[in-house]
Amino acid sequence: MVPVVALVGRPNVGKSTLFNRLTRTRDALVADFPGLTRDRKYGRAEIEGREFICIDTGGIDGTEDGVETRMAEQSLLAIEEADVVLFMVDARAGLMPADEAIAKHLRSREKPTFLVANKTDGLDPDQAVVDFYALGLGEIYPIAASHGRGVLSLLEHVLLPWMEDLAPQEEVDEDAEYWAQFEAEENGEEEEEDDFDPQSLPIKLAIVGRPNVGKSTLTNRILGEERVVVYDMPGTTRDSIYIPMERDGREYVLIDTAGVRKRGKITDAVEKFSVIKTLQAIEDANVVMLVIDAREGISDQDLSLLGFILNSGRSLVIVVNKWDGLSQEVKEQVKETLDFRLGFIDFARVHFISALHGSGVGNLFESVREAYDSSTRRVGTSMLTRIMTMAVEDHQPPLVRGRRVKLKYAHAGGYNPPIVVIHGNQVKDLPDSYKRYLMNYFRKSLDVMGSPIRIQFKEGENPYANKRNTLTPTQMRKRKRLMKHIKKSK
């Protein structure tokens, strides 16, 4: 079993910075704001070929109220999940009452705990950590996570010996296939497209929407545990959380994202970071669930987010949350508004649910699988060309300057989203209305549901363009005889 290491401490002691160092990513938000990390953030790390899971947690300072109380609960849950705890303190701030309270709790859990004093850059490490011996946790390991100083020593002298003592049994990571594919893509070693099997990889599912529409409640309902901080306050999820899961024998990676606000309202620098994370999560996903609040209706921000999803070419499932408790009259009004404002999204399934009570949630994954299968289905050139020919027979392309646009053949140009490349003459002059007709014809013929489909046009090249008319020897002899005949006749 892969060991789990939790980073625990007061807010702003550098847990996320160390997390990014250990996992060699920038997945955890890092800035000089207390309470920046609100949820457990999981990452994969490695030292000398030994893998471990690192958990970045929200800070605990003993003065929590409101959402901070829930942050503290998330940190305590991380301690329970972990095999070993790295308890981080701030060498510059010195020993604080909250440090003593955390140390007391850790001693009561009897977990292997190592005390790490961060922010020792520019200080005498020996002098800076003296006060922390009062915590009674043994040796102190000074580091400067932002510059990487002392981190390698921490790994070699603390985590590596501990993992060797742990001697984990060889087991197959249930998500190994996902990570192997991820690394192959990072190294440019992905398999040839012909060998690619979309069913062999987890479906990456991003849950997005405006703040406080119920994204984290939906995530927790799907997972069956309180994994993401939920509180009735906009913006309680500031980072994107990647969660492996399995449902009906199919593997998924669930991405719970920060709520997206209007740009004009994003004044907090941290929230700007989160919006970028959300948009990156959409790019990284295979299927996106757009969550809309039934009681607030569709806002311009919902439409902006929808536009980004469509431009990214991601498969889409629209989820209208908080459907419970609405009168029948209000429900009809909401449906009419949806039809009016989302009429251009005719390929996406719409689900009406209550994430809080669970009604309608069970039907979501059928649409997710349908959308993913539609976006990754392989279709041969012969079938695409046949569909194109039928479309042309049903409705001829218009005349352009007195000449009919000629479509020759079609082939697949990519997947997720499906791309159909059509070759022909004068295709650049096709009107948008005919392009939409072709797109809808391909969608209907291929039964593509839940995924956008893109049509690209390529102009057929004239093989004789810019070439001199070179005569063959036979043509040359005929030409000579013709010229002699013309001269004699004169």
From Swiss-Prot:
UniProt domain KH-like: residue ranges: 377-461
SUPFAM superfamilies found in the cross-reference section: P-loop containing nucleoside triphosphate hydrolases
One Pfam family in the UniProt entry: KH_dom-like
Domain of life: Bacteria
Entry binding sites for GTP 1: 9-16, 56-60, 118-121
Quaternary structure (record): Associates with the 50S ribosomal subunit.
Protein name per UniProt: GTPase Der
